[in-house]
Every structure is written in structure tokens, then in C-alpha cells.
Amino acid sequence: LAEQYARRKGGRCFVSGSTRDIFQGYAGEHSVILDELRPKSIPYADLLRLTDPFAIGHEVMAPSRYSDKPVAANLIVITSPYSPYEFFYEQGNNADTDGFDQLERRLAAVIEMQQREICLCQYAGNGWYLPMPDYTRPNPYSRFARGDDSSVDPAEVYESVLGTSADSSD
């Protein structure tokens, strides 16, 4: 969904890679997806700099393993199993210096992918995001919606790896 949206907004997009260097391979794309972002993947100060809407006038640098890279993105989509508040909290930030409100005001929308629904959420305070009732749709991407029961049978995997007892001559 994030990639579809980014492509509709601006053609080519960059999807982050390894947690050791999330901007590895970035080549100036104007749409960036920070996919499955975790609190330890990027320092909070760098995330604030990347998402600063007023930083477009001056060069924003993304942290990268060997040398930082200039970012020319006008769209940044973040996917994460963490809510924005959980992400902030898990980083162990000093709320007096870099408070959560700095991140919250940079977010145009917080969309939660639930098993059955996709919800636009609103920050309700005290770390809670609540779905907005008029902005909820069925989630066609979930296993539930697709009827995908791709659960794995451990015994089947075991037999596949080791072979049947008749094949044990290897």
C-alpha cells in the first residue's frame, strides 16, 4: 500500500533496506519509504530532520554507513509495527529536549493497518492513537481478507528437511 501510494505521487521511490544502513542504495528519489522502521534503526534527531517540512530550503542529510547522503524527498512514508508514540518512547528520548510533539506535528496522517480494517487515526493524548470512525475501510491486504491460511505444519517441515525414515540412508 505504501509503495502504491508513493508511486502514484511521484514515480520512482526508494524503499529502505538494512537496519544497519537504511539509506543504502538511496539515489535521490523524491519518494522515500522507511519500511518496517524500528526505534534502533535511526536516531530520533535524524528522523526529526528528515521529516521537517521546513528543511526543504536547505540540504537534509540522511544517516548512511560510510557517508551521509543528501535527501531530496518531498514524500516520506513510514511503515512500522510501532505507533508514533511507541516509536518515540522506545528510543528512550529526553522528553524535555526532543519531545514527542515535535514528531507528532510532522505527521500528515497516521494510518493503522488492522487485521480487518485500515483506519485513519488521530492522536488522543497520553500516547494513544484512536481510529476515526468515518475513516475506516476494509483491509483487502490482510490474510483474513484474502482467505490466506498459509500456516505451516512443523511436522511437514521436519519431514521435508530430514526426509522420511526410508530416505535416511543419506
Residue ranges of model-derived segments:
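The feature encodes the CheY-like receiver
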Residues: 40
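Short, flexible loop segments at the rims of nucleotide/cofactor-binding pockets, characterized by
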Residues: 9-13, 54-56
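Short basic/glycine-enriched coil/helix segment immediately N-terminal to the Walker B
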Residues: 25-29
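Walker B catalytic acidic pair
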Residues: 36-37
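Short beta-strand-centered segment that lines the nucleotide-binding/catalytic pocket of NTP-utilizing
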Residues: 11-23
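Glycine-rich phosphate-binding P-loop
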Residues: 1-8
